[in-house]
Amino acid sequence: MSEKKYIYLYFAILFFAIFIPSFISYGGIVADTLSYIKIADSIPDVKSNLFPLGYPLIIRLFHSLTDDYYFSARIISILTVLLIGVFSYFKKFFFKETVILLCTKIFVFCIYNLISEGLFLGIFYFLIYYFHEFFTKNKKGWSFILPTSLLFLALFLTRYSGIFIYIAILIFFLINYRKPTFKNYKKDFFVVIILSGFFLASYMLYNFLNFGGIMGENERFSVDKTSIGLDIIRNFLGVMNLANPILGIKPAHFTSITIIIEIFLFLINLIFIYLIYHLFKKNKKWKSDFTITFLLISSATYLVLVIISKFFQGIEELNTRMLSESSFPLFLSAIILYFQSDYNKKIIFYLAVFSLLFNAAYLIKIPQNFLKRKAEVENQIVNLKDKKYYFDNIKNVEKSRKEYKIPIINKSFYYEHGNQQKAYIDGNIIISRKPEINLLLKDTVKNKKSVIFSSDIK
């Protein structure tokens, strides 16, 4: 297919990244978004190292231009897509493959939602570029060492799991150390390992001296062992979904209908696992390609380490978001290999278009004008003073539910989307605008005048 069609698709991707989030009911604001914003607002007097400072710091920098943390975070997401696409095109760095990659579920989810994974994937992309230049164009010396080491630091400053990618290059180095074809790369690669390790260790030391913990481990919840059986099942399903570039549906509760959906999705996951396996089995030249082997080792290392982390820390279940950093190098390596093969390129192009449209629609679910609601809520709180808390006091009111109809069998079921409830959305808008306000889970504050109640927001 002509490059022009990929350019058009990229512009569609960029257009979607700019406008689609405005029609998502919650605007892309999730619980972690509020944590990032609170950290950003507290700079330089930061009290927590639960999250690294990189993403909140950039939010704070853009806040000086927008005076609105929501739009600051949204600009970061848009710029990530813009820079990746423009850089790929002008540097001729796998442009077609990059456009396909930007259509996968991980980028749609991580860009439309205001989370640090979007920025992380962007930094990871540029890191891969430098390694590719190092292996294929003999880019050596400090022109490779310094930017690569700084990108490793940027990964770690964005997400602590960036250390998993650092561990991946250690494994990559050990695997290839004795290979004759790796001889010319040893010295510079080793210097990158040392310098990057120094940068990461320096930030860990900063955290330890200022917060008493290296990577926020002393501020995380302990592992809930009461539901370990269900957690294992859900995490297993999440891992099996890692190789699926299109579908990442994850119901919050198990019902007879959602179990059927999970079984159907599981079968599709198996198909994608087989297709990727067959792709690599048929094209064995990848074994001598350092870029692809680096991507695969990064994917596998990240997956293993995040699974281990899940069983020792109270982090999220292994869903699309948590596994995006593992899916990313796997997808990119498979897409590169696909384009190097004699397969019909129209197939992957139209699958990418479908993925973009489907995942955008999946996140929207029920189209709403988030920016309009944001303006309405902010107008109601603009003159409120001495407010310190937000509390949802209408939890007993029937929550909004969406009806889903199943074709063929002519059945329907209702599903309650937690992030589409009015009180939840309003609370996120309020706290993102006024980070000094804290969310109350229980109405325990005696001074009711300091509380914004959800029932007060019309």
Residue ranges and their predicted role:
Residues I24-K38, K47-L61, F71, F211-E217, ...:
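Extracytoplasmic catalytic/substrate-binding loops of multi-pass membrane glycan-assembly enzymes
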Residues S25, K187-I273:
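Membrane-lumen/periplasm interface segments of specific transmembrane helices
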Residues L53, L57, L65-L83, C110, ...:
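Loop-to-helix entry region of an early transmembrane alpha helix in multi-pass inner-membrane enzymes
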Residues V86-F107, L121-G122:
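Transmembrane-helix signature of polytopic, membrane-embedded enzymes
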Residues V108, F144-Y160, Y166-I171, F198:
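Membrane-interface alpha helices of multi-pass inner-membrane proteins
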Residues Y112-F120:
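Short acidic/glycine- and proline-prone juxtamembrane loop motifs at membrane-interface regions
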